[in-house]
């Protein structure tokens, strides 16, 4: 009887013994991959579906170039991108000028490592609904026409959709109180364009590259909305890398990431698609000191304490 019981017990335990190590190994492999995954993100300055598509493609490219798993993690708003970078949930982030400064001030050792060719000479656009009767102008003094009009920015933390437009408005002698009602905050550039196009606001401030892309794809009704003024140039978007990647991947990861961006070649179809999605001709080096003007304006306007 005892022999029968022991035989039955062995038959029960043998499959478990065979399966358990494999299950543990699989779990450890998945856990190791997750721990080694480079998490990338971006401020949500455009339609979330467009962002998901472009950064998924970029993640695939970076994974191949860097030899480590790379995953794009979307965030809900600009401040969430800064917070996620601060706590290390995101390690490589596409920030605007303002959010990049905010992030680096909260993470000592973080570095701006790359920007598009257009980002060292970036511009905002003031756009208007044509029924507003406001005519395009060539000088900053023309902004005085906006007094008593309805106006919307993009995100509250946007460089091209809020910070620099407000700075230029102040240079022209306008305060937010000079607009009709309260100045709006649409949340992103696409929404600003649609709100002005619909006549919800007379005027809005938008990112020049987003405007160009949407007009090229005929997503804007130019019979209803037009550009009033193009601002002077300033430094804007850039990639910022978290200092924790040195311990996780080695001291040379930042240089490898830079090389991957600089390697993007419009003559290579796969690369051209990524560059088109990111609205770039190429990527170039940058450094933290390039954003000193943005930091100064941010402190002046109260967006940086």
Mark where each language-model region is.
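A ligand-binding cleft/hinge motif common to bilobed small-molecule-binding domains
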Residues: 94-107, 170-171, 197, 202-222
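Short helix-initiation/N-cap motifs at beta->coil->alpha
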Residues: 72-83, 96-98, 176-194
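Ligand-binding cleft/hinge of the Venus flytrap
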Residues: 56-67, 155, 160-185, 215-221, ...
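Short, well-ordered beta-strand elements
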Residues: 30-49, 68-73, 148-152
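A conserved helix-loop-strand patch within extracytoplasmic ligand-binding domains
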Residues: 116-172
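C-terminal motif of bacterial Sec signal peptides marking the signal peptidase cleavage site
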Residues: 15-18
